[in-house]
Amino acid sequence: MRAVRLHEHGGPEVLRQDEVPIPEPGPGEVLVRVHAVGVNPPDWYLRDGMSNLPPETRPKFTLPVIPGTDMSGVVETVAPDVDGFSAGDEVFGLLRFPGFDGGTYAEYVTAPASDLALKPAGIDHVHAAGAPMASLTAWQFLIELGHDHPSPFQAARHRPVALGPGTRVLVNGAAGGVGHFALQLAKWHGAHVTAVASGGHEPFLRELGADEFIDYTRNRPEESVRDLDLVLDAVGGSGSRRFLRTLKRGGALFPVFFGEFDDEETARLGVTVSGTQVRSNGAQLAELGRLLDDGTLRVAIDSTFVLADARAAHERAARGHIRGKIVLTVAQA
């Protein structure tokens, strides 16, 4: 089969298409013929050798490696101990995350059955492949954590904030993968949502349900709003601290990419800073699939590239200002 692999770390140019054997499913797994692959930040973290992560949190892996965690496709075979899936089923999933051995940049992939859900009938493989990591991240931050695994970023267990009418939420990076799902999930629960993105994304985010919009290229969001119940910062990192001043006492800041925070400052302000690491979860993905199927949620596609052009997809990601998701398509013989 064809697969894109990393033989060394570096820029997009190190992504190389190879011929490799079709993998064999082990216990609890299915073999999936891949139709489309979602491109996610961990793909380029892996490509560049995890240089953005502290050494103690870097997962272990050996080269060559097939990157990728998100996919949508059709079940080819199932292991004898697998119930719930059969050959011919259309499925989608976030595979083996937070490990980095999903291996979805390929024509075939083995997948733990527990990581999969049936693909919503109302969307195609491209849109389904764009959903798993981003939608599960938004779900586990905002709706239900769904596991008891400790976070590498904090000692306390992450607890979502109750959302409902009257809850004031700001989503930073609202046009991106996680951000556009977070906006929609908050609106699904009746929250009042302010979306932060560059100005060209305003019509798109208004269409998704944003009540207010801040163009960060013209106005500083941390100076534009106050008394928020929750900030979901899909950009995260060191810049998240600026949002502390936007929260009311009892409010919460959820940075998707964790940064450094002063415990004394958050205690003085009476706010909570919390995050988690998304994990594969087929049951939660099935719930998200129902929302995708009935139109409550939609997947925005920024651009598509064929599998052999994975390098171009990573180059597109590096340019930023992504609206929704980048997806690789896999030709079917």
Put a short name on every predicted segment.
Residues P98-A113:
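A structural motif shared across PLP-dependent enzymes of the aminotransferase-like
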